[in-house]
């Protein structure tokens, strides 16, 4: 490798963007095949190639940042800006769902019976499973903060315990959300209420699954002594993402579950 006189990371040629694009093609084509022809062959192949690409790409990034020293302070600064912009883009994603919900609920049309929830819809009780889900996510926000402080203070065992608790709470939230979906009396095809409810809460649920995966990777890296109090952007990004998921859920709970019911 040629000598460089700057602190920026010049990425080496990698096949993973190509395999990632190919897996995205397989995933979208597989979804079409599944929806229209009830065949999951392409979808399964797309999921496998996507998982393989993610694993190998992340492995390369971890090796470059942890063992080869490519993630200098100026590179970490750029990564932080990138993560902030990514979270901002996600905020606007959810803003679209909230806009659709409030646009439909504040001035319900005659087609909906002139009321909200629409005639024939039995909304979920916000004081049952949704309130438990809120408590679970708020507790996970506390535990991820505990993990961060433990890392900064060099308390490895506390960090491991707090991170494991956060992951377990995230998985528990996902199970509760799935059980709630099975108990609803309406579906995503039941007009604007069903579509906005399942789209907003389902998209948030997907983010919880992604965040839980992110934290599991961080726990495995922590067990391999990858993080120090000075060099831990991977965990920091996961913590930011998890707090974002917490805040979005609070807005979902107040808007869709409590006020919308």
UniProtKB/Swiss-Prot annotation:
<dbReference type="GO" id="GO:0005743">
    <property type="term" value="C:mitochondrial inner membrane"/>
</dbReference>
<comment type="function">
    <text>Component of the cytochrome c oxidase, the last enzyme in the mitochondrial electron transport chain which drives oxidative phosphorylation. The respiratory chain contains 3 multisubunit complexes succinate dehydrogenase (complex II, CII), ubiquinol-cytochrome c oxidoreductase (cytochrome b-c1 complex, complex III, CIII) and cytochrome c oxidase (complex IV, CIV), that cooperate to transfer electrons derived from NADH and succinate to molecular oxygen, creating an electrochemical gradient over the inner membrane that drives transmembrane transport and the ATP synthase.</text>
</comment>
<feature type="transmembrane region" description="Helical; Name=III">
    <location>
        <begin position="78"/>
        <end position="99"/>
    </location>
</feature>
<comment type="subunit">
    <text>Component of the cytochrome c oxidase (complex IV, CIV), a multisubunit enzyme composed of 14 subunits. The complex is composed of a catalytic core of 3 subunits MT-CO1, MT-CO2 and MT-CO3, encoded in the mitochondrial DNA, and 11 supernumerary subunits COX4I, COX5A, COX5B, COX6A, COX6B, COX6C, COX7A, COX7B, COX7C, COX8 and NDUFA4, which are encoded in the nuclear genome.</text>
</comment>
<keyword id="KW-0812">Transmembrane</keyword>
<feature type="topological domain" description="Mitochondrial intermembrane">
    <location>
        <begin position="100"/>
        <end position="129"/>
    </location>
</feature>
<keyword id="KW-0496">Mitochondrion</keyword>
<dbReference type="Pfam" id="PF00510">
    <property type="entry name" value="COX3"/>
</dbReference>
<feature type="topological domain" description="Mitochondrial matrix">
    <location>
        <begin position="151"/>
        <end position="156"/>
    </location>
</feature>
<comment type="similarity">
    <text>Belongs to the cytochrome c oxidase subunit 3 family.</text>
</comment>
<feature type="transmembrane region" description="Helical; Name=II">
    <location>
        <begin position="39"/>
        <end position="62"/>
    </location>
</feature>
<feature type="topological domain" description="Mitochondrial intermembrane">
    <location>
        <begin position="179"/>
        <end position="198"/>
    </location>
</feature>
<dbReference type="InterPro" id="IPR000298">
    <property type="entry name" value="Cyt_c_oxidase-like_su3"/>
</dbReference>
<feature type="topological domain" description="Mitochondrial matrix">
    <location>
        <begin position="225"/>
        <end position="232"/>
    </location>
</feature>
<feature type="transmembrane region" description="Helical; Name=I">
    <location>
        <begin position="16"/>
        <end position="33"/>
    </location>
</feature>
<dbReference type="GO" id="GO:0045277">
    <property type="term" value="C:respiratory chain complex IV"/>
</dbReference>
<feature type="transmembrane region" description="Helical; Name=V">
    <location>
        <begin position="157"/>
        <end position="178"/>
    </location>
</feature>
<feature type="topological domain" description="Mitochondrial intermembrane">
    <location>
        <begin position="34"/>
        <end position="38"/>
    </location>
</feature>
<feature type="transmembrane region" description="Helical; Name=VI">
    <location>
        <begin position="199"/>
        <end position="224"/>
    </location>
</feature>
<feature type="transmembrane region" description="Helical; Name=VII">
    <location>
        <begin position="233"/>
        <end position="255"/>
    </location>
</feature>
<dbReference type="GO" id="GO:0004129">
    <property type="term" value="F:cytochrome-c oxidase activity"/>
</dbReference>
<dbReference type="InterPro" id="IPR013833">
    <property type="entry name" value="Cyt_c_oxidase_su3_a-hlx"/>
</dbReference>
<feature type="topological domain" description="Mitochondrial matrix">
    <location>
        <begin position="63"/>
        <end position="77"/>
    </location>
</feature>
<feature type="topological domain" description="Mitochondrial matrix">
    <location>
        <begin position="1"/>
        <end position="15"/>
    </location>
</feature>
<keyword id="KW-0999">Mitochondrion inner membrane</keyword>
<keyword id="KW-1278">Translocase</keyword>
<dbReference type="GO" id="GO:0005739">
    <property type="term" value="C:mitochondrion"/>
</dbReference>
<dbReference type="InterPro" id="IPR035973">
    <property type="entry name" value="Cyt_c_oxidase_su3-like_sf"/>
</dbReference>
<dbReference type="InterPro" id="IPR024791">
    <property type="entry name" value="Cyt_c/ubiquinol_Oxase_su3"/>
</dbReference>
<keyword id="KW-1133">Transmembrane helix</keyword>
<keyword id="KW-0472">Membrane</keyword>
<feature type="transmembrane region" description="Helical; Name=IV">
    <location>
        <begin position="130"/>
        <end position="150"/>
    </location>
</feature>
<protein>
    <recommendedName>
        <fullName>Cytochrome c oxidase subunit 3</fullName>
        <ecNumber>7.1.1.9</ecNumber>
    </recommendedName>
</protein>
<dbReference type="GO" id="GO:0019646">
    <property type="term" value="P:aerobic electron transport chain"/>
</dbReference>
<feature type="topological domain" description="Mitochondrial intermembrane">
    <location>
        <begin position="256"/>
        <end position="261"/>
    </location>
</feature>
<dbReference type="GO" id="GO:0008535">
    <property type="term" value="P:respiratory chain complex IV assembly"/>
</dbReference>
<dbReference type="InterPro" id="IPR033945">
    <property type="entry name" value="Cyt_c_oxase_su3_dom"/>
</dbReference>
């Amino acid at each position: 490798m040629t000598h460089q006189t700057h602190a920026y990371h010049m990425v080496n040629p990698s096949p993973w963007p190509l395999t990632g694009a190919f897996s995205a093609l397989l995933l979208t084509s597989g979804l079409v095949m599944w929806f229209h022809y009830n065949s999951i062959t392409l979808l399964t192949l797309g999921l496998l190639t996507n998982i393989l690409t993610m694993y190998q790409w992340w492995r390369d990034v971890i090796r470059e940042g942890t063992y080869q020293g490519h993630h200098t302070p100026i590179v970490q600064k750029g990564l932080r800006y990138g993560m902030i912009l990514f979270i901002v883009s996600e905020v606007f994603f959810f803003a679209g769902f909230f806009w659709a919900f409030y646009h439909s609920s504040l001035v319900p049309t005659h087609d909906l019976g002139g009321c909200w929830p629409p005639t024939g819809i039995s909304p979920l009780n916000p004081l049952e499973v949704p309130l438990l889900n809120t408590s679970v996510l708020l507790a996970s926000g506390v535990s991820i903060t505990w993990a961060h402080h433990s890392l900064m203070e060099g308390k490895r065992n506390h960090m491991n315990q707090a991170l494991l608790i956060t992951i377990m709470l995230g998985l528990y939230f996902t199970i509760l959300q799935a059980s709630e979906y099975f108990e609803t009396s309406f579906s995503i095809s039941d007009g604007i209420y069903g579509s906005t409810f399942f789209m907003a809460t389902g998209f948030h649920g997907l983010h919880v699954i992604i965040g839980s995966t992110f934290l599991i990777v961080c726990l495995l890296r922590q067990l391999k002594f990858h993080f120090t109090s000075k060099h831990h952007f991977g965990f920091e990004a996961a913590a930011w993402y998890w707090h974002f998921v917490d805040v979005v859920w609070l807005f979902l709970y107040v808007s869709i579950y409590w006020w919308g019911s």
